[in-house]
Regions:
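Ligand-binding pocket segment of bilobal, Venus flytrap-like solute-binding proteins
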Residues: 139, 143, 150-222
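A bilobed periplasmic-binding-protein/Venus flytrap-type ligand-binding module shared by bacterial periplasmic
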Residues: 106-113, 149, 231-244
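Short beta-strand->loop
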Residues: 8-11, 74-83, 93-94, 96-98, 109-111, 117, 123-126, 211-229, ...
């Protein structure tokens, strides 16, 4: 019987597919992939219960993979490779999930619209001088939700609430559906600064999205706060996986 691993993934990147292809070629294990939004995958796993076909769960956002573990959707993983390769703080103490990638929430600015020398932290986006110059994703974005949670942890609820109020009052137009659209808007001077995951800018600069997006990205300046908010994507073995060893591999 042909070996296989069924992957439920909340990641939607062509680079992942190239990894699956290489994995299949090197191991002989066929990868069967189901992609959907992270919340949808968690709900699907709950619904399927013991009848679930999932072996490996890949989710974007630390909160989502933690919630999956708390919901009893994952199982303990015994892997010396993962234990040795993944640093402390980027893995579950109960060994139910391990971070696979990190993503930094950076600010991307147009130096022709805003004075980048005066912007050092996320909190600076609440400054009245940026009125009508800030671009943001809508509040459903897990990246922004986690950023806000991180700010509450570091600066307290009242200070975070004041920051959010000030920043939102500086928003230039309706909220954006994705990070790439924010980089484009900043480049076109539709706004002066926005918050995005660092790799979107890197992908655009590399020309992965085409020459036009590469030009858009080159017109912007990336500002990384210190400390910066770093989120993860992570993987775990499904509670009722029938191909556990293949999933760990």
């Amino acid at each position: 019987t042909e070996k296989e691993v069924k992957v439920y993934s909340g990641r939607h990147y062509n680079t992942d597919r190239s990894v699956y292809k290489k994995f299949a070629e090197e191991t002989g294990i066929k990868v069967r992939l189901i992609e959907a939004a992270g919340i949808s995958l968690i709900e699907r796993l709950k619904r399927e219960g013991k009848n679930s076909q999932a072996d490996l769960i890949l989710l974007v956002d630390a909160a989502r993979i933690t919630n999956a573990a708390k919901a009893g959707l994952l199982q303990r993983i015994e892997s010396s490779n993962l234990e040795n390769d993944v640093p402390v703080g980027l893995k579950d103490p109960n060994k139910e999930w391990y971070a696979l990638t990190r993503r930094v929430r950076v600010m991307v600015a147009n130096p022709k619209v805003v004075d980048v020398s005066k912007i050092n932290d996320y909190t600076d986006l609440a400054d009245p001088s940026l009125k009508g110059k800030v671009c943001l994703r809508n509040r459903k974005s897990p990246y922004n939700q986690s950023l806000v949670a991180n700010q509450i942890l570091n600066k307290g609820e009242s200070e975070t609430k004041a920051w959010l109020s000030g920043m939102i009052s500086n928003v230039s137009q309706p909220f954006f559906p994705g990070d790439i659209s924010i980089v484009r808007a900043v480049s076109k001077r539709k706004c002066g600064i926005g918050i995005v995951n660092h790799y979107y800018v890197a992908r655009m600069l590399a020309g992965i999205n085409g020459r036009r997006d590469a030009l858009y990205a080159k017109r912007t300046t990336v500002l990384t706060p210190n400390p910066a908010h770093v989120n993860i994507s992570a993987g775990g073995v499904a509670k009722y996986a029938t191909n556990k060893n293949e999933a760990i591999k």
